[in-house]
Amino acid sequence: SSSILSYVTVVQAVHIRKRPAQTNDMLPAHGTQTFTEDGTFTVPASVHKILITACGGGGGGKSISGGWGADYIVKRAFSVEPNAVIPITVGKGGLGQDANSDPEIEATDGGTTIIGNLITISGGFKGGDNTRIHKGTKGGEDTVFAIAGLQGTSSGGSSGSTGGQGGGACFGNGGDGGTNGKYTIGKDATNGGTGAGGGGRAQRVGNSSSSYSKAGNGGDGIVIIEW
């Protein structure tokens, strides 16, 4: 009986330590930050990996040809250091050709999106050069072909041509091409969505002169960072 009492005494003397409850400060942070303009991203404390979705700027429409869509990545993982500051450059959409402005606005390629030293994403080519192969450098082994802007379609005879649609992108549709009215130029081409190419202009050819609509601008790029 004395041994039983001793056992009970020992058990009662044991101090059971409870595991402390986890607080928000002890848990890894989670969130999303979107950039449509240049800026900086500060990696939250305790975060060692981020997911990036991003694209360059779409190319502007040129002549009757739509601009190219930009290169893009979707939820690609990158290793980072906590509290690191990463500069972000968001590629701007290229300008669409406008022969009616003074001076004339020439079409331009879409801008490049740069995310620190992690990745560089090419913008789309301007329209009018669909023979080029657009191959974006994504870092590592990945290579994605951009979607080319469609060539403008002829409206037949000597009346001229409607504009081609801009090349699409992961985030937006290409701009619509300019249109021809019965006797005059119709609507201007529209701008591309995010990262997409602008539509090509319409052109009408007369006996003594020609008239043109405005080609669409490419859409600006975007950067979305998740952690």
Task: Spell out what each predicted region is.
Residues 93-96, 136-142, 149-152, 160-169, ...:
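Collagen triple-helix signature
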Residues 48-56, 125-126, 149-155, 185-189:
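Short, hydrophobic/aliphatic alpha-helical segments
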Residues 13, 73-75, 170-171:
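Extended low-polarity, hydrophobic cluster-rich segments
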Residues 31, 39, 76, 111-113, ...:
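Residue-level detector of beta-strand structural context in well-folded domains
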Residues 5-10, 158-165:
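Low-complexity, intrinsically disordered segments with a bias for serine/threonine
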Residues 1-51, 222-227:
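Enriched but not universal
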Residues 64-69, 118-129, 140, 146-149, ...:
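Terminal beta-strand-rich extracellular "head" domains
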Residues 34-37, 54-117, 131-134, 198-224:
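Glycine-rich strand-loop-strand elements at beta-sheet edges
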